[in-house]
Design a protein with these regions (language model features):
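Juxtamembrane membrane-water interface segments that cap and precede transmembrane helices
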Residues: 34-53, 113-116, 196-213, 464, ...
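Non-cytosolic membrane-interface motifs at loop->transmembrane helix junctions
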Residues: 117-127
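Glycine- and acidic
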Residues: 121, 255-258, 449-455, 551-552
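Membrane-interface capping segments at transmembrane-helix boundaries
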Residues: 76-79, 596-599
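Interfacial/capping segments of alpha-helical transmembrane domains
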Residues: 31-43, 177-190, 480, 490
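TM-adjacent membrane-interface loops and short helices in multi-pass inner/ER membrane proteins
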Residues: 140, 216, 354, 359-363, ...
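Short, charged juxtamembrane terminal tails flanking transmembrane helices
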Residues: 1-3, 598-599
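Alpha-helical transmembrane segments of multi-pass inner-membrane proteins
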Residues: 2-29, 57-74, 90-113, 126-404, ...
Length: 599
């Protein structure tokens, strides 16, 4: 890596500086529309956003600027060509092209192309944003040819991370400058009309929970796992004292923010970064013995503290709660004239209606086809005789239903389970229908699942989401369903499964696993190319850092970048790619390869 003494700021670096330091901080309340409202499991198509919209707009703009720069500036094209014609560097661009190309084709062939291109509900990470990620990676990889230029990006990251982590640390102490009466007028300035019953901006996570400007506490974990290793390195190694102070303050606030977020994925990601650092420090174990001992003591202390605070952690990871569902009902399937119900005990009930019957006129059959005796009536409550059917109550009521694009009141038979869960059925012109939580009629059908049985509660109910995601993988062996189309591929009409695992009317928009997300949305080749890029970075960093002789700055900062990237990859086992953190990742990913280009 060139040891240039020039410290001037070049214009082409501005997109990198803005993306790494400013974009994660952008928040503003805006309204938007989504085509998701046409689906029976979604309430409507109009939503309010606070964290994602401005980030998306900024990234699309930066991506366009970078592409224009590459097309207009000859010297940039020459630099890119020089990288392409270098044998050891060409493989990076080939892998990146596979990732970007397969992602683009998947998006262009997606069922919901608008979402795939521009971003969808609660994600806003469409193809245009992914194109910006790739452009940022290329800009960093092609053009950061000197140590000082790389330091400009690192220093921008330090300043941005300090601002963000101070906000997060204050939230951990119950002080939230994003959700209070003073800042609300600023954050709502672009709203033409505020939602009804608007009482100011409030955090849905509760007081004392850190989310900073990253939309969700989980993404705080991904951010800290990515940025903390480089921040700590700069706090120790930066040549300028003012940046050492900024880095040290940022590192402390990041740790407080991580604790406030409660993100286990982030904690594990930080632990993985520490492990990678230890692995490389073993290249000179005698010289680094004091550091290794210190890291070991701190690591043991952190693990001991975590286990003391979470004594049932390993039991819950290995066994879950041992309950595949929390409801009396395991599944329901309807066909227009009947509903087949499977109870948690294994018993089966079939509710059957005649073609011309009202919704209140039904009979119940057991698994052998014999009628089950009933007591009471529909208006006072019907119960089935037998201990196996305890906790089930059928009642007559009326409910407003969205049917044929109009809201109308219909007679409804309500099945209440254990005085907690209710399931409404109505007889419409098309036959018997289940009325879901958003007041729309739908059918109940078999939902394919794989694995995690008895562990649906694993990792905050990720076990359930993964069990419904695994069957989707086989349809994405070549191409995926398209960026931000996961919500449409996932069985969001798995009403029983979602209620049993506490999701109720929530729309599952992501698999809570970055690798499953890429596979399903972009296709298996895109995932393999993405993983190959990391393995290439890991291998080249090993070759660089395990050379004999005194460690130089290039080797040390290569290790810092690798630790951060590794932490992000590990956190991705339980977190998704998010527009709040991914721009920082792709830039640091590109910078990490740029540092290695001299090899």
């Amino acid at each position: 890596m060139e040891q240039s003494k020039k410290t001037s700021f070049d214009f082409y670096m501005l997109p990198l500086v803005l993306a790494v330091a400013v974009v994660p901080l952008l928040t503003m309340m805006t309204s938007y529309s989504s085509g998701i409202g046409k689906y029976t499991w979604a309430s409507g198509g109009s939503f309010v956003d606070f964290f994602l919209g401005f980030k998306r707009g900024a990234l699309i703009l930066l991506g366009a600027v970078i592409i224009i720069l590459f097309c207009a500036a000859q010297w940039m094209r020459v630099q890119a060509k020089a990288v392409w014609t270098t044998k050891n560097q060409k493989i990076v661009l080939i892998l990146l092209a596979v990732f970007g190309g397969v992602t683009a084709i998947s998006a262009l062939l997606a069922d919901e192309k608008i979402d795939a291109l521009f971003g969808g509900f609660e994600q806003m990470e469409g193809l245009l944003v992914v194109t910006a990620y790739v452009a940022l990676f290329c800009l960093a990889y092609f053009l950061l040819s000197s140590e000082n230029k790389i330091q400009v990006i690192v220093h921008a990251l330090l300043i941005g991370s300090l601002i963000l982590s101070v906000l997060g640390a204050l939230q951990a102490f119950g002080v939230d400058y994003l959700a209070n009466d003073v800042t609300t007028p600023f954050f709502t300035m672009f709203m033409h009309a505020l939602p009804k019953k608007f009482n100011g901006i409030t955090a849905s996570f509760g007081k004392g929970v850190s989310y900073a400007t990253l939309y969700n506490p989980n993404y705080v974990g991904s951010y800290v796992a990515l940025v903390l290793p480089l921040t700590i390195y700069e706090a120790v190694q930066d040549e300028k004292n003012r940046y050492k102070i900024v880095a040290a303050a940022s590192a402390v606030c990041q740790l407080i923010m991580l604790k406030g977020s409660g993100s286990l994925a982030g904690m594990v990601g930080v632990g993985a970064a520490v492990c990678v650092a230890v692995l490389f420090l073993f290249s000179d174990i005698y010289k680094n013995r004091k550091i290794l001992c210190g890291v070991f003591v701190v690591a043991v202390g952190l693990v001991a503290l975590f286990l003391w605070k979470n004594p049932t952690f390993f039991r819950s990871v290995i066994k879950g709660n041992g309950e595949p569902c929390s409801s009396h009902i395991s599944s329901m399937i309807s066909d227009g004239t009947s509903v087949k119900i499977t109870l948690h005990s294994g018993k089966m009930i079939t509710l059957r209606w005649d073609a011309d019957a009202t919704v209140y006129e039904f009979e119940a059959l057991n698994e052998n086809g014999k009628k089950i005796e009933m007591t009471g009536d529909s208006f006072s409550g019907v119960k089935l005789k037998g201990d196996a059917y305890q906790g089930l109550l059928f009642e007559a009521t009326k409910r407003q239903i969205t049917y044929q694009e109009q809201k109308t009141y219909f007679d409804v038979l309500r099945l209440t389970v254990d005085d907690k869960y209710s399931w409404d059925f109505a007889m419409l012109g098309v036959g018997l229908r289940y009325i879901n939580g958003v007041g729309k009629p739908d059918m109940l059908h078999y939902v394919e699942s794989f694995g995690m049985e008895g562990r649906y509660d694993f990792a905050s109910n990720r076990g359930y989401i993964w069990s419904r995601t695994f069957p989707l993988l086989k349809r994405a062996l070549l191409l995926g369903v398209g960026q931000d189309n996961f919500a449409y591929a996932f069985p969001n009409d798995d009403y029983v499964g979602k209620v049993n695992c506490g999701f109720n009317e929530q729309i599952v928009t992501k698999p809570h696993n970055m690798y499953l997300q890429i596979w399903v949305q972009d296709g298996l080749p895109a995932l393999l190319a993405f993983l190959a890029l990391y393995l290439l970075l890991f291998g080249r960093t090993i070759r660089k850092c395990f050379k004999k002789g005194k460690w130089n700055h290039s080797q040390k900062i290569s290790l810092a970048f690798l630790c951060g990237v590794s932490g992000y990859f590990v956190a991705g086992l339980a977190n998704d790619s998010s527009i709040c953190v991914a721009p920082v990742f792709w830039i640091l990913f590109g910078v990490a390869f740029a540092v290695l280009r001299s090899e």
